[in-house]
């Protein structure tokens, strides 16, 4: 079976950088097992699969290399950008069905995609010490930010971690510890950012 996968970067600046996602059109006849296999072959954090829907304009499912997730923001942007660039959709307002519900998406005349998502929910907090060993930085450095380490969800639960200016390039994340932490605490991943 040959399946065309569009490789799209969201959040680019002047066509550079961004967050990559796979986008597969006409996915109605694909099983979840096939979607997972395709996602594993693509190897990006998420691949979006577009299917027809009776109530929404499209149903969009999102798969990582390990399984389906409820929602993915950058893959949503990639999905509707692809539909616009391929002249399947024009500028306007649309709705997509995801595992978290029906969400609006707008495509502006210049092709910019704007999406609505759930309001952020704070789900949990972790100690500086607990996180420091996982990302390879002293707990005192994390604590110096005076910001909590929280699980925030707008559809997927992520651990949000701030580090002081100059420390982002110094962290040494342990991929195995992160994977184990995420599985144990039912979170998707870590979002680490540097304070200015």
Regions found by a protein language model. Give the residues of each.
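Active-site proximal loop and beta-alpha junction motif in alpha/beta enzyme cores
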Residues: 1-71, 77-196
């Amino acid at each position: 079976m040959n399946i065309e996968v569009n490789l799209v970067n969201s959040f680019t600046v002047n066509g550079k950088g961004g967050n990559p996602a796979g986008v597969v059109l006409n996915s109605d006849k694909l099983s979840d097992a096939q979607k997972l296999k395709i996602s594993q072959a693509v190897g990006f954090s998420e691949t979006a699969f577009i299917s027809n829907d009776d109530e929404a304009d499209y149903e969009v499912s999102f798969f990582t290399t390990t399984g389906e997730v409820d929602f993915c923001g950058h893959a949503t942007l990639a999905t509707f950008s692809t539909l616009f660039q391929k002249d399947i959709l024009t500028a306007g307002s649309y709705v997509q069905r995801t595992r978290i519900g029906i969400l609006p998406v707008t495509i502006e005349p210049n092709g910019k995609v704007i999406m609505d998502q759930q309001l952020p929910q704070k789900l949990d907090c972790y100690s500086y010490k607990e996180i420091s060993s996982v990302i390879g930085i002293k707990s005192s450095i994390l604590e110096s930010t005076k910001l909590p380490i929280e699980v925030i969800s707008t559809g997927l639960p992520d651990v949000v971690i701030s580090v002081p200016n100059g420390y982002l390039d110094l962290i040494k994340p342990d991929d195995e510890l992160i994977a184990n932490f995420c599985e144990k605490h039912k979170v998707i991943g870590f979002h680490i950012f540097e304070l200015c």
